[in-house]
Amino acid sequence: MAPAWSLLLALLLLSCNAICSLGCHLPHSHSLAKRRVLTLLRQLRRVSPSSCLQDRNDFAFPQEALGGSQLQKAQAISVLHEVTQHTFQLSSTEGSAAVWDESLLDKLRTALDQQLTDLQACLRQEEGLPGAPLLKEDSSLAVRKYFHRLTLYLQEKRHSPCAWEVVRAQVMRAFSSSTNLQERFRRKD
């Protein structure tokens, strides 16, 4: 009987390693929600990107904040939280509801809200570890400034459909990069 329990325990530990990320225990639903968010962001597209070429802009995407090799786990979780929170805020504006399908936005906000809950719990867990490094605000600040530039751009373009398409593409890029960051830390664990 003991070998059977040992095998079950080993399988449980292996499966936990496969679904946990960043050293904290995010539920399997978190990775499913991340994929769901990217799918929903794709589905929100209402305008052909080629018709909005004149609206493209360089928002100085903070690639280093999302892909830096010096980022510690707690810092990475903080950056992931920032990206998710700002994506949630953008999807909750009146302008987004005017341009995008409300039922898709509701689904997107639900998925983002679940991720925020998971990340907040994970951040508390990582910050509570003895010897955890103090968070450097540089990466989180870079993400906040990036999303601020997106918000200013929307205001400047008067929340036009093309402006929202450009922002949607930028948010997808940020979210994809945050997913890649999460995967990188999961592989290290």
From Swiss-Prot:
SMART domains: IFabd. Residues 1-23 form the signal peptide. Keywords: Antiviral defense, Cytokine, Disulfide bond, Secreted, Signal. Its main location: secreted. Disulfide bonds join C24-C122, C52-C162. One of its GO terms (molecular function) is cytokine activity. Coiled coil: none annotated. It holds the Pfam family Interferon. InterPro entries: 4_helix_cytokine-like_core, Interferon_alpha/beta/delta. One of its GO terms (cellular component) is extracellular space. It is found in: Secreted. The keyword Disulfide bond applies. GO terms for biological process: adaptive immune response; B cell activation involved in immune response; defense response to virus; humoral immune response; natural killer cell activation involved in immune response; positive regulation of biosynthetic process; response to exogenous dsRNA; T cell activation involved in immune response. Produced by macrophages, IFN-alpha have antiviral activities. Interferon stimulates the production of two enzymes: a protein kinase and an oligoadenylate synthetase. Belongs to the alpha/beta interferon family. This is Interferon alpha-D. It comes from Bos taurus.
